[in-house]
Amino acid sequence: MADIQDEAGPFLPPTISPPALLSGVSQTYFSPIPPQLLADNTPCCLGVDEAGRGPVLGPMVYSAFYLPLTLSDPLLKQKHSFDDSKVLTPAVRLSLMKELCTKDTELHDNCGYATSSLSPLSISSGMLKASKAQIYNLNQQAMDATIALIKGIYERGVNVTDIFIDTIGQPAAYQKKLERVFPTAKITVAKKADSLYPVVSAASVVAKVTRDIALEVLWADRTMAWGSGYPSDSKCVSWLKQNMHPVFGWGPECRFSWGTAKDMLETKGGVKVDWPEEEEEETQKLTDFFMAKRDQAEVDVDDLGTWFGAPAGVECF
């Protein structure tokens, strides 16, 4: 995990809400829009990237970053050396994020951003639906988060003309979907876009810092280190083993839909819970209800007849 503290103490960006994190709620944040972008309807470019798609611990964070089209290279690449967040050190990422959040700095006055932090609970509840038809897989969740961020920025009045997005899947298919949703923008979807386009590099930094600090907030009251949160990290696996509750598993930090977590619950002492199928009586048809009422009415009539005596036949006379 990245060290989020510096000489001034811990830094908590506005993209982080500790109460939401600790309660397992997904959260979305939109930064204030630089006034000049709205004043003259400045053409802007926008980049989207994510952090935390693969880990079993912590949120998956999507970030959208925008600024005037003419400033993308000179401000982001040449002056501040934005790059793929994985290439930059934690200290450099944190410094860039702090400047972005500090008033009267060049980044703050010319750039805007938004984040969508999908909580482990939200991710897992979508992926673990009872039927396949109801499953809300990770790709669908990622696509919806991306679209919601871009729409939100458009709705706030930003004149986005060019959109650049990093993708893991097939760029062409992803791009066609987005072009149908945003037909007026020039859209570029590419693998490794975070190292090709400065505006995507900036989005990757915002997403990465937000996720790193989210992990720190989730870990704050714990003593055993959990590493990066990836299933391939031995510290992460050890933490999961040592902190698994046999009934409830783990807290809001864990994605229960990940194979690492599911296998551990099934093979390392987790208590199996059987959920009974719904009985037919609970889904009784309306016609069955009226049939039952009719049968009961016939019984009531018969009972009334015997109360006054059995009917006399011809043979009685």
From Swiss-Prot:
Presence of the UniProt keyword Chaperone in the record: no
Reaction(s) catalysed (UniProt annotation): Endonucleolytic cleavage to 5'-phosphomonoester
Name of the top EC class for this enzyme: hydrolase
EC number, as in UniProt: 3.1.26.4
Cofactor: Mn(2+); Mg(2+)
This protein's name: Ribonuclease H2 subunit A
Superkingdom of the source species: Eukaryota
Family, per entry: Belongs to the RNase HII family. Eukaryotic subfamily.
Keywords: Endonuclease, Hydrolase, Metal-binding, Nuclease
Naturally occurring in which organism (per UniProt): Neurospora crassa (strain ATCC 24698 / 74-OR23-1A / CBS 708.71 / DSM 1257 / FGSC 987)
Record Pfam families: RNase_HII (PF01351)
